[in-house]
């Protein structure tokens, strides 16, 4: 019977150690930066296409980019943020716009 209790104690200690070692992933803000050349309609398109915002929210964020110089499009894990930044920047270049999407640690 002592062996069963030892096993249960070991499992509890192992579970506690794993919980201590688990950390939430680092999060990153994906940011759209203003420029003087990208049309507002294109920025709205980007916000809808890559961040799934409805037209009203996309318009609000586009105006934030326009008037404040930048806007946070969302906060994501590193891999998701990097992918979104790469896709947005490629889409902008493919459409011959200088729109710049960046990320920074949240």
From Swiss-Prot:
One of its GO terms (biological process) is protein catabolic process. It holds the Pfam family ClpS. InterPro entries: ClpS (IPR022935), ClpS_core (IPR003769), Ribosomal_bL12_C/ClpS-like (IPR014719). Transmembrane segments: none annotated. Gene3D superfamilies: 3.30.1390.10. NCBIfam families: PRK00033.1-3, PRK00033.1-5. Involved in the modulation of the specificity of the ClpAP-mediated ATP-dependent protein degradation. Belongs to the ClpS family. Binds to the N-terminal domain of the chaperone ClpA. This is ATP-dependent Clp protease adapter protein ClpS.
């Amino acid at each position: 019977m002592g062996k069963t209790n030892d096993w249960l104690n070991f499992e509890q200690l192992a579970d506690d150690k794993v919980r201590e070692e688990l950390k939430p992933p680092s999060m990153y803000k994906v940011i759209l930066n203003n420029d003087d050349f990208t049309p507002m309609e294109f920025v709205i398109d980007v916000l809808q296409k890559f961040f799934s915002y409805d037209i009203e929210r996309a318009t609000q964020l586009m105006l934030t980019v326009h008037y404040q110089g930048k806007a946070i499009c969302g906060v994501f894990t590193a891999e998701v943020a990097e992918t979104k930044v790469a896709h947005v920047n490629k889409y902008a270049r493919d459409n011959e716009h200088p729109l710049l999407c960046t990320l920074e640690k949240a």
